[in-house]
Amino acid sequence: MTNFITERIPASWSGSCLAIGSVTAFAPMIEGGTTQLPVLIIRLILLGALGTWLIAGLRRSTLSIPRTALWWPIITFLGWSGLSLIWSPYTSVSLQWFLSLLLYAVFFLMILHGVNGEQRIRRFLMLILLMGLFEGGLGITQYLYHGESRAKGTFFNPNFFSTYEAVSAVLAMSLIWFGTEYGKAGKLFLILTATISSTAVILAQSRGGAAAFLTAITVVGYVRYGKSSLFLLLVVILGTILFPNPLKQRLMDVGTQDPYAYTRIEIWDDATKRVQDHPMGIGLGMYKYASFQYRFPIEDAIVHYGKRAETAHNEYLQLAVELGIVGLAFFVLIIMVWTAEIKRIWRPDLPQASQGILVGLCAGVLVTLVHATVDSVFHEPALVLLLVLEGALAVALGRQVRGTQAEPRCFSLPYHAARIVLSLVAVGGLAYLAIQPAAAWLLANQGNHASADHDYQSAISWYQYASIADPGSTAVRDGLARLYVQRFRESGDPDWLHQAATELAVSMSLNPLDGRPPYRLGTIYLLQAEQPIWASYRDSLSAQAAQAFKNSISVDPFSPFGYFELGKLYRGKGDRTSAQEVFERAISYEPNFIPARMALAELAQERGQPDVAHMHLRAIETIRWKYQGWTLSSLEQQFLAVQSPKS
């Protein structure tokens, strides 16, 4: 075989290989590919590749798809995901997630279609190692010289950086332990990559990433050296425990520094309840939006229910919540079929170098799948693309080591210009769908800049453009409503309040799971009721405000603000009993919410119950004394009545 390091890269690659390499190299470069710009670029590259494949095939009157047993479970999973759009409460977001899944399948197709030789497999291995070396070196530099508490490379989350580096490290280790043909330069490169990437995993200080890394290198060692490799695992674990290192220090400190650090058990229990409540799933991407009804308390925090689990911190549970038991089963089926295909590839008589490549690729897949049990790694495009790349390369390697290339599945379609036009329209529609959120984000960002300069009219114009670009975005609607309220405060023109209420009503219709728009709508109705021009509608507006707060409570039952505002309305109407009930419900969830306790004390005084009033006042003093000297967030200040609750 040609030397792994020094083989010459040809002057040109096929278009699919260039697209695969471009996506792989670019994906982690901007915060792991999670923000709007990199997501858009990745999507457009993949859509361009899809369009090219379709047009080329239609011009030849044949669409060819590489054979693999994985297509049926992939198509089944995608089909179920598409079907879930029917019952998703927030279709716009679910549609974007479905597009992501579809393009991951396109990426898989591109790899199987383009990687048709051992040299190309090796070049992509080199790309993975080079990216790991670059990211690892950057992360180590950040930690040692730039004052970062945790290495993170170009990722926004050190945990995801840890996964990326662990994949690179186990691939390099597997090639070292199995390889015999790489020469001195090749071995030095692999040793350097393994060392840099392993060090980066430690400096990232990710508990889940470290566990996944140890699991993977144990598997690699066991396959290569048998049970004796378990001794190496024991040495690594003991070294981590006995000798000072950043990972050990974080494991010791994290519980005292972050009251939310050990809440994963509660989050998983919460996710299990969601699956029980919605066995068919709630829709793609809906986990965080349904979190308002599934908050859980953190007793040591001022705001007990202040945190919402926006992810399950276990991707398999999250799949079950969003796509139901059936969706999770289809995803597990993909893993099982892939595993069966790898078993068919593995043979004791495989060349040792091929064994090293196959084991390294499978270990990289294992890293991501194991880390997915404790973190949200499937939400990071760079990690998912790397997972798909390694999984597909392992399948492609199987075709090479068998010595035969299975004939692709061909679909004959007589050439017709209309088919090409329809394909272009379909790909163009997907591109439009991909561009929508990025365009809205860009336009809204311009609006934010104008708002920061107090140019609210320009800000409104930018947000209106954003609402045209992406009509399904509730964030844009909410931003518009806030700007309209700001314009009302400046001008006193009550028509701005009417426009704000209209935008929030649209937001509620787009996403009925979010408890914030109905609460804000209620506060706007109260502002409208205060305007002289609407004096004759005051009772009606107050009733609408009360209904809005009730809607807020039904969607977000753990937030005290809806109860507080509703209680004030009841109290204003003289209904002290109802007011007392909702104030007491507020403090039953949030005992540190002083505004509700103050209201209860005042109600007790009005009812001639001084002992009850004194009890509430004493509780208020105790709460303030307990948290005296704390650095308070804006929300905590509202709870402790340092500042008034905001609308």
Predicted regions and their residues:
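Transmembrane signal-anchor hairpin modules in multi-pass inner-membrane enzymes, especially those
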Residues: 1-83, 89-130, 175-189, 221-235, ...
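Hydrophobic transmembrane alpha-helices and their immediate junctions
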Residues: 325-359
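Membrane-interface segments at transmembrane-helix junctions in multi-pass inner-membrane proteins
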Residues: 143-177, 205-208, 315-319
